[in-house]
Amino acid sequence: AVSESNVIGMVGGYAIPEVNRLMHAFMAGAREMNSDVTFLVNFLDSWYDPPKAKESAFAMIDAGADVMYAERFGVADAAVERGKKAIGNVIDTANDYPGTILASALWHMEATIDKAIGAVADGSYTADDYSQYSFMAHNGGSLAIDKSLVPANVVAAIAAKEAAIRDGSFVVTINDETPVSDN
């Protein structure tokens, strides 16, 4: 809905389940809004290498991507330099890249921590998988959208989907497989 070229580039750190599921969730949402969209995907095999991330993003932009999913730092810098848009990840970097960050998928780790600490406090703690509490349905995630950059119909569709996730009428498919490029 925002991409004019129908090509979105995605640069990730490592192809691990926690990263893969974020990328797949974004891909599913983008495809729901625009069934013609295709993806270019690359992993850096590094958690922090902004120059490498930037070069990967430049290559994707040169291959036609006009929106970048910035799972790593450096990607939004490439988007700024080439006049493209980006989606942020984990934290909201819109103030660092004004006019570039369409939205950021935010992680609220407090929901997970509160659940675990609450279980310790009430004596019910067990070694368990608390990862579900990092999901939007449990207030572990949200979106920060720049409404000046994202069309109103897209903002409305996102708000409706977020409400459906929170009330349980839509369940996000968790896909831990490594995402790959469409072309």
Predicted regions span which residues?
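A residue-level marker of the well-folded mature domains of exported/periplasmic proteins
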Residues: 1-183
